[in-house]
């Protein structure tokens, strides 16, 4: 055979860097060269090997050594070990690929184990290889195997409660590799290991063979497994039809792992294994008989990477090998070889990085055990025996009209669980047959005696049956009457007058503390706003002393048809811990509303969007578990489905139990938003693609749509980034909904951070939001799935509640501490602002809740000043320029007066009023404090510059007077500390009669300053003061630096 020219390389080694002095990696292949009936034939596998090597890069050259294990077109257990010995002797390979046939693989595996050389194959399905003893310790099976098929069959028996017996029929032609024998061997050993009575027989391909087969079936089991060519199955089923074994008492499992019977052929169409080139009568008989047949095949990987790989495989096979391959399950074996080479490269890389060598084959093989990684064939999971976990599909006649076979269930080998597609199996009698019905096999049982009954026994039996029928009829009539009475009583009805509304604080006070996860001080529960991002709150009220949630219905009236009455009755009948309790409904126009149990902790969406709440994974799993329990109960109830599941429809009660709300009562539902509103699309972020298309769905379809909504909520809980979080994308809800509705590959789904999340949780999300509803699990399966990877979920209800309460207490303690710090900071700011408005001593009295009494002061000194020409300056400036000027000036003044024992009373326009000697008395210091402050302000004005008129000089006019005053706080709103008395008026007159850039002081102030003897004053003379007559006044010129007086 002319092999394609390949340079095989392994890039995974040492992170893409070839070790110094390393030799080429040698890959030896022992596979059939010509016989394409084998899925592991070299023309099928060779292109996959080439693709795998190309995918790995060019860090280390690989020598490819291929030899055929065929002898006259068949697998040879004699030739294969000789080829392997030659390869070892002349080429010393690092890895052996193949053989796929069982007997050659056994021989070669013994040599490989002795050489400590890894042997990788995607064939060799026999159960004998599962025990990796000293003979097969280096054998790695990266493809399907018979023991994994047996595990699937045992799981099927457990599902259908078949625990007694089974019968196996198979064809065993020793001229080839005995594929049927080794395939059904896995089923035999698995069922026998489950303590079932399992009988087997080789099918005789000779006249009388079908009769022998049906005789064997009658004597040994109702659950029959058949493994052989499709023609053999046809012969057995035709005979079974003639003997009435297809009446529903038997089920026939056809083990066709590569699904060849479901592919189109010369005489049959795709999915119709019953079609054959027979008479019309026989064809009809086969079609009827095939209703009792279930076909088991490998599962074709659903991931797009495998589809791309298969396309490339077919192209390479045609170009490099001159072979035309068709898309089929046989190509799965090539994909398994591909993933096996990647696995070997990954483990070899790790071994070298840890200091090992490629020659340490046992160490490399041991490191492959228990591996999980994503390959082109999907999730690859290796068990402890280095056998890959295998997925299977169970096919049934899904459409009785056309006779087409469709998937009824998928089996995940990694999870050991069956996922039902929702398509019912067409059992002839409406239910699975019994595997060990009474008197079918154990004829020695005395209860199986069929002696005719006596006349007396017949009369007694008839009388008993009559009484039973009478009793049942009476019960049904009574039940019907009670139902009509209950419908007529309308126990659910609530009058609008019975609902009480009032102050929300009173409701919250009566309902207990509301310093909880939800907001305080509101009688509302959560609902989505028009923008879909923030929460408003649903109305609450009182009904019979209890706080209830009230949802108004946007309808003018409700017609009480029989259907509506049944809906309301069903809502009252449904009671479960994880569903909000339906209390009643008000149908009094215009106040039509639904009244339900109120959950004070808010909605799940509120909790997830509140960053101050710390949710560890124990708490999150608890919320998820509550949601799954509630949905499982709802799906099994008379209501059957939710239809609008979202995180805002999941609420949390005071005991931190999640409950589902807004279910049922389809007649009350209405859409208030316009068809193109933002809020409408925001609510559809949880809606399944099949619902977005607008097509009506059956009940099972609605349940699968709920599963999709659950997946979006699961993503919300896992990431806490809002519904349908998309990393790096900023799309509106409308754009997201349109992309989901389009259903184009790759399907549009939320972002998942696989590095941060549990792999099994991610897998559950992806299954729940699968595009095909039949691929989604039901909530019963989801419950079991979560129970397995949530190890902490097995604690008791009390322990779980205590853990929730402890976590909430810790979170609340942290929240209170943060709020306390925030309060103290705001208190400090408020006090600072208060001290700027009022004197410190006055502010302290107000803080203590005391009334500030007016107080008389015998002697204080008051300062007044204004700007000469300010009116003209204002007229020539804009209002903003005037404000800027005064702000700059008074900021300067305020900074200066902080250095003196004075109190700033007020500023009015350009007027500035300051006092010393109150509210804290300072003896005789008030006059010199004001004097020094006035001198400082006058000096500051000389260097002050106006921004918009930098060349102009401000002219400050100052007046000072000393005398008695009365002071106190005036007003309740915006209180002010005001001064009263003639001294205030006199000080104002001193300022208004003064001159620019001079300090005008009264004689009383001059007397107070003279006591110090350090201030320079100049007599101005007698000045006529309005309302005062003539007063002798002085100019304050400065202060002499010398020995202090009083100060």
Curated annotation (Swiss-Prot):
One Pfam family it belongs to: ANF_receptor
Enzyme class: lyase
Coiled coil: none
Annotated keywords: Cell membrane, cGMP biosynthesis, Disulfide bond, Glycoprotein, GTP-binding, Lyase, Membrane, Nucleotide-binding, Osteogenesis, Phosphoprotein, Receptor, Signal, Transmembrane, Transmembrane helix
Cytoplasmic face of the membrane: 479-1047
Membrane topology, as annotated: Single-pass type I membrane protein
Post-translation changes: Phosphorylated. Phosphorylation of the protein kinase-like domain is required for full activation by CNP. Glycosylated.
EC number(s) given by UniProt: 4.6.1.2
Swiss-Prot/TrEMBL catalytic activity: GTP = 3',5'-cyclic GMP + diphosphate
Keyword flag Nucleotide-binding: yes
The keyword Disulfide bond is annotated on this UniProt entry: yes
Principal location: membrane
UniProt xrefs under PANTHER family: ATRIAL NATRIURETIC PEPTIDE RECEPTOR 2, GUANYLYL CYCLASE
Protein family membership: Belongs to the adenylyl cyclase class-4/guanylyl cyclase family.
Protein name: Atrial natriuretic peptide receptor 2
Species annotation: Mus musculus (Mouse)
């Amino acid at each position: 055979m002319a092999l394609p020219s390949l340079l095989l390389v392994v890039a995974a080694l040492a992170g893409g860097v070839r070790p110094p002095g390393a030799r080429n990696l040698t890959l030896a292949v022992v596979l059939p060269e010509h016989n394409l009936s084998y899925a592991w034939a070299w023309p099928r596998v060779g292109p996959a090997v080439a693709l795998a090597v190309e995918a790995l890069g060019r860090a280390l050259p690989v020598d490819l050594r291929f030899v055929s294990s065929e002898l006259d077109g068949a697998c040879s257990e004699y030739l294969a070990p000789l080829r392997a010995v030659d390869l070892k002797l002349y080429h010393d390979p690092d890895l052996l690929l193949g053989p796929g046939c069982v007997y050659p693989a056994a021989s070669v595996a013994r040599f490989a184990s002795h050489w400590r050389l890894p042997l990788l194959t995607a064939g060799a399905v026999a159960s004998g290889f599962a025990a990796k003893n000293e003979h097969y310790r280096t054998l790695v099976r990266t493809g399907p195997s018979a023991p994994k098929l047996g595990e699937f069959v045992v799981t099927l028996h457990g599902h259908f409660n078949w625990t007694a017996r089974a019968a196996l029929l198979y064809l065993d032609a020793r001229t080839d590799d005995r594929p049927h024998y080794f395939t059904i061997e896995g089923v035999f050993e698995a069922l026998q290991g489950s303590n079932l009575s399992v009988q087997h027989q080789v099918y005789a391909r000779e006249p009388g063979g079908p009769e022998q087969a049906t005789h064997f079936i009658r004597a040994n089991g109702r659950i029959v497994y058949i493994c052989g060519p499709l023609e053999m199955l046809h012969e057995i089923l035709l005979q079974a039809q003639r003997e009435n074994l297809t009446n529903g008492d038997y089920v026939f499992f056809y083990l066709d792992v590569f699904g060849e019977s479901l592919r189109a052929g010369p005489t049959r169409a795709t999915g119709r294994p019953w079609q054959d080139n027979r008479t019309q009568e026989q064809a009809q008989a086969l079609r009827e008989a095939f209703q009792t047949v279930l076909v088991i095949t490998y599962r074709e990987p659903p991931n797009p990477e495998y589809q791309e790989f298969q396309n490339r495989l077919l192209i390479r096979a045609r170009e490099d090998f001159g072979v035309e391959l068709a898309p089929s399950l046989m190509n799965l074996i090539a994909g398994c070889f591909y993933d096996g080479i990647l696995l070997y490269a990954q483990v070899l890389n790790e071994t070298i990085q840890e200091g090992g060598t490629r020659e340490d084959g046992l160490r490399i093989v041991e490191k492959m055990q228990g591996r999980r990684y994503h390959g082109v064939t999907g999730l690859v999971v290796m068990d402890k025996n280095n056998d890959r976990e295998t997925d299977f599909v169970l096919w049934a006649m899904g459409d009785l009209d056309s006779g087409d076979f469709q998937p009824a269930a998928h089996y995940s080998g990694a999870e050991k669980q069956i996922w039902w597609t929702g398509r019912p199996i067409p059992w002839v009698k409406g239910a699975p047959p019994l595997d060990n019905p009474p008197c079918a096999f154990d004829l020695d049982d005395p209860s199986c005696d069929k002696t005719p009954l006596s006349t007396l026994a017949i009369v007694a039996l008839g009388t008993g049956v009559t009484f039973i029928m009478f009793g049942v009829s009476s019960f049904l009539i009574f039940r019907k009457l009670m139902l009509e009475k209950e419908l007529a009583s309308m126990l659910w009805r609530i009058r609008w007058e019975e609902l009480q509304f009032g102050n929300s604080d009173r409701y919250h006070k009566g309902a207990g503390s509301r310093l909880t996860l939800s907001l305080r001080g509101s009688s509302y529960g959560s609902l989505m706003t028009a923008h879909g991002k923030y929460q408003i709150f649903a109305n609450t009220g009182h009904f019979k002393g209890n706080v209830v949630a009230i949802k108004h219905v946007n309808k003018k009236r409700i017609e009480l048809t029989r259907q509506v009455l049944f809906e309301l009755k069903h809502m009252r009948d449904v009671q479960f811990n994880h569903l909000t309790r339906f209390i009643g409904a008000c149908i009094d126009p215009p106040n039509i509303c639904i009244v339900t149990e109120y959950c004070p902790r808010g909605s799940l969406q509120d909790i997830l969007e509140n960053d101050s709440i710390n949710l560890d994974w124990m708490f999150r799993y608890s919320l998820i578990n509550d949601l799954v329990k509630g949905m499982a109960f709802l799906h099994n109830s008379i209501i059957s489905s939710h239809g609008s599941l979202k995180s805002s429809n999941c609420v949390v009660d005071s005991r931190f139990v999640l409950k589902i709300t807004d279910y049922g009562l389809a007649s009350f539902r209405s859409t208030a938003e316009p068809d193109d509103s933002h809020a409408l699309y925001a609510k559809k972020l949880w809606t399944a693609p099949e619902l977005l298309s607008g097509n009506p769905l059956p009940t099972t379809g609605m349940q699968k749509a709920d599963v999709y909504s659950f997946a979006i909520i699961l993503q919300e809980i896992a990431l806490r980034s809002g519904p349908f979080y998309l990393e790096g994308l900023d799309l509106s809800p409308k754009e997201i909904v349109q992309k989901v509705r389009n259903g184009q590959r790759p399907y549009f789904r939320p972002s998942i951070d696989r590095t941060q999340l549990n792999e099994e949780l991610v897998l559950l999300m992806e299954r729940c939001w699968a595009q095909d509803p039949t691929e989604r699990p039901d909530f019963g399966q989801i419950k079991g799935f979560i129970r397995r990877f949530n190890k902490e979920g097995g604690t008791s209800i009390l322990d779980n509640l205590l853990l929730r309460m402890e976590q909430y207490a810790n979170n609340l303690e942290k929240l209170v501490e943060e709020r306390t710090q925030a309060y103290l900071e705001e208190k400090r700011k408020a006090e600072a602002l208060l001290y700027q408005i009022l004197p410190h001593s006055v502010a302290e009295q107000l803080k203590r809740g005391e009334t500030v009494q007016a107080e008389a002061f015998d002697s204080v000194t008051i300062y007044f000043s204004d700007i000469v020409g300010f009116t003209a300056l204002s007229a020539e400036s804009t209002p903003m320029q005037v404000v800027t000027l005064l702000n700059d000036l008074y900021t300067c003044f305020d900074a200066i007066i902080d250095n003196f024992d004075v109190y700033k009373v007020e500023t009015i326009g350009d007027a500035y009023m300051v006092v010393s000697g109150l509210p804290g008395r300072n003896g005789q210091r008030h006059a010199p404090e004001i004097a020094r402050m006035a001198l400082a302000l006058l000096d500051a004005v000389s260097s002050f510059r106006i921004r918009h008129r930098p060349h102009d000089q401000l002219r400050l006019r100052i007046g000072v007077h000393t005398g008695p005053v009365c002071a106190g706080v005036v007003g309740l709103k915006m209180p002010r500390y005001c001064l009263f008395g003639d001294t205030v008026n006199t000080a104002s007159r001193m300022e208004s009669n003064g001159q620019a850039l001079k300090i005008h002081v009264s004689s009383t102030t001059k007397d107070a300053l003279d006591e110090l003897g350090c201030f320079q004053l100049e007599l101005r003379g007698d000045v006529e003061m309005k309302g005062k007559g003539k007063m002798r006044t002085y100019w304050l010129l400065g202060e002499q630096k010398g020995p202090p007086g009083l100060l």
